[in-house]
Amino acid sequence: MRTPRVLTATGVLVALAAGTAAAAAAPSPPPPPRPQITDAAVEKAVARLDGTVAAMMRTTGVPGASVAVVHDDKVLYLKGFGLRRTGERGTVDPDTVFQLASLSKPVSSTVVAGALSDPAEWDAHVPLPGFALKDPWVSDHVATADLFSHRSGLPDHAGDLLEDLGYDQSYILDHLRLEPLDPFRISYAYTNFGFTAAAEAIAAARGTSWQKLSADTLFKPAGMTRTSTEFSAFRDAPDHAATHVKNPDGTWSPRYVRDPDAQSPAGGVSSTARDMSRWLRLQLGNGVLDGKRVIPADTLARTHQPQILSQPPTTATGEHTGFYGLGWNVSYDDAGRLRLSHSGAFELGANTNVTMLPLEQLGIIVLTNGAPVGLADAVALDFFDVAEHGRATTDWLAVASALYAQALDAGRSPTDYAHPPAGAKPARNDSAYTGTYDNPYYGKLTVSANPDGSGLTLSLGPKPLKFPLTHYDGDVFSFETAGENAVGRTGVTFADGTVRVEYLDVNHLGTFTRQ
C-alpha cells in the first residue's frame, strides 16, 4: 500500500487500542506498570476467537485466515479458517503459507538483531554498493536504525512506484538518490526500500545474501520451517494462500499475484501461523525459544524501543502518541504498558497483524488472504479488548475498515477524469503527443498511436506496461493505474515537449522530456 495508508491506519488503531486500558490517577513519578490481565481473562478472550473470526469473515467476505495466540510461552490458540483460494476445496489450516506483507518488517528486524553483537551496532553506518541518498553527508552517516525506523529523510514510500513499473531492487535502490529528502533523523516517512537497503547492507557486510542470513540467523534456529524471504518459496508451496481482491459485486477473486522480492526485507516474508507463533514466543521470551537463546536479548530489546514519533497525540479523540521502533509500531497505554504491533497490507490481496503486550506475555498473530479491509487488525484489537475488559468495547471491524477505506481514497486524484468538464477542448493531432520521453528516475515513457486509430497508448517500465489513454480536456488525458499502488484514474498532461504523469509526480519526479 502507498501513501500514509498502512502506517496512518495502523498508527491510529494502535493509539485507539492504547486508550482502551483503564486510566488511573498516578503519582509523580508513576510506579512501574504491573501485569493486569489474568489467566481467566485470556481464556475468555481465546474462547471468543472462533466466533469473532467467523463473524468478521462473514461480514467482510475475506476468504481465509489463520490465527495464533501466545501467552506465558504457550500457544493457546492455533487455527485456520476458510479457503486458501476461492473456487477450490483447499482449506486454511495452521500450516497454510501466507504472504506477510509489511509484517515482514518486525521479522526482519529480528534477523538483524541476531546478526549484531552489540546494540550500538544499530547506530553504525553500513554502506551498500549502489545505494546513496541525495545529500552526500546523510549518505555517509545514515545508520541501520535510521532506515529501519523510517527517519532517513526519504519521502513516504519512496521507490514503491518503481517497483510497480517492474524495476528490480538494484535499479530502485540506485535511484533513491534522486528522491528529495526531509530533515534527517527528525522526519518520519514510511519507506519500504529504505528499510530494504539497510537489511541488504547488513547481509552484504557479512558476505552473504539477505535470504541466507534470514534463514541461518532466525528461521532455522527458531524452527520456522515454512518461513522464507523468497517469493518462489511461497509460490511453490502447495498449500499457500492465494491473494484475493474484492469484486464490485462483493465477491472475492484471486486476480493478482504479488511478487515482493524487490523489497523482500520490508514486505517479502511468507510464513504460517504455526511458524509465527514460534517467532512470537521468541519475541515475548526476549530472544529465547524452547530454552535456547536464538537472538541476543540486548540487540532484540533495541527493536522494541521508540526511535521516532510517528503518530502525534490527538486530544480531540483521546488518541495516544505513537512511535516507530526498529520494524515495530511502539506505543504505551494508560497503565504505562508497552504495546508492540505491526500490520501488513497488500492491495493486491493480503492483510496481516501482530500485536503483543510484553508485560502481559501475551500476543496474537492474524494472517489473511484478502486485500486490506480491516479484518486482521480488527481481530487482534477485539481480542485484546476482551482480554482487558471482558468484552469488546468497540466495533473494531467498523473502525478498522473505515480507516483503510479512508486511506485508500486519500491517494486518489481530486480530478474526476471519468467526466470531462463542460466545454472541454479537443485534443490535437496524435503526432503532437507521440514519441519517446525520458526521465532520470522513471526511465523512458513512450506514447504511440493505436494502429486501428482508436487513440493513444502510454508505455512505461523496463518491460513496458501499456496504459490506454482517454482524452479529458485539451492536452490532458488520463489512464487507469494498476499494481500495488494503484490510485484509480490519473492525469497525463502534455506541455512544451514534456509530459507530466500525475500519480508519478508525488515527489515532483513525474515529468518526462521528449527526446
Regions of interest found by a model, annotated:
Residues 1-27:
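Secretory targeting and sorting signals
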Residues 25-75, 203-216, 220, 254-515:
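Catalytic loop of the DD-peptidase/beta-lactamase superfamily, centered on the K-T-G motif
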Residues 37-100, 119-129, 134-136, 168-179, ...:
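Short, conserved catalytic-motif segment at the N-terminal edge
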Residues 39-46, 62-63, 97-105, 119, ...:
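Solvent-exposed, acidic/flexible segments
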Residues 48, 64, 94, 99-103, ...:
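Active-site helix/loop module of the DD-peptidase/beta-lactamase fold
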Residues 80, 154-240, 249-281, 289-295, ...:
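Catalytic-site signature segments of enzymes, centered on catalytic residues
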Residues 84, 118, 150, 282-286, ...:
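Generic structural signal for alpha-helix termini and adjacent loop/cap motifs
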Residues 108:
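Active/ligand-binding-proximal structured segments within catalytic/core domains
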